[in-house]
Amino acid sequence: LTFLFASAKIGAILVTVNTNYKQHELEYLVENADIHTLCISNGTFDSDYVDMTYTMLPELKTSQRGHLKSNKFPYMRNVVYIGQEKHRGMYNTAELLLLGNTITDEKLEVQKQKFNCYDVVNMQYTSGTTGFPKGVMLTHHNITNNGYCIGQCMKFTENDRV
């Protein structure tokens, strides 16, 4: 959730990835969505996301963090490992947080003023049962309004806690 709120605050678009994706599905999504920064964890069940990422981005093992140049994925620049382990070419969570100190409050405010509630904040991919998965773009307003409408349907009041 931290990455979701942080990306929303700076106007970045968070692309959610199905944790059951196999190698070819992840590669399709990264290429289709023009991913700039990929945030990964160890993996789930039988998926090793670190290994999948190195397979997808072999240049990562010899790249400086933040300076990835991939022939296959030209928009990809950064990989962040969610955790404290260090992996070649990737920022870990602590290093990412330190990068926040390089941006002044003034620059952050300028960035925040560049977008509004009708800008895309999240892209979710369909299951792809009838073809390749398609990215569905959701705005800040879409997500907020969805929560509001659900609250209305469930007859929530200001006294309720969710």
Model-derived regions, located:
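Structural core segment of the AMP-binding/adenylate-forming
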Residues: 10-98
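Alpha-helix termination/capping residues and helix-transition junctions
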Residues: 32, 73, 114-117, 156
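Generic structural signal for well-ordered alpha-helical scaffold segments
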Residues: 148-152
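Cytochrome P450 catalytic-core helices
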Residues: 1-5
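Extended low-complexity acidic/polar segments
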Residues: 84-124
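Conserved AMP-binding loop of ANL adenylate-forming enzymes
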Residues: 118, 142, 153-162
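Conserved AMP-binding A3 loop
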Residues: 112-115, 121-145
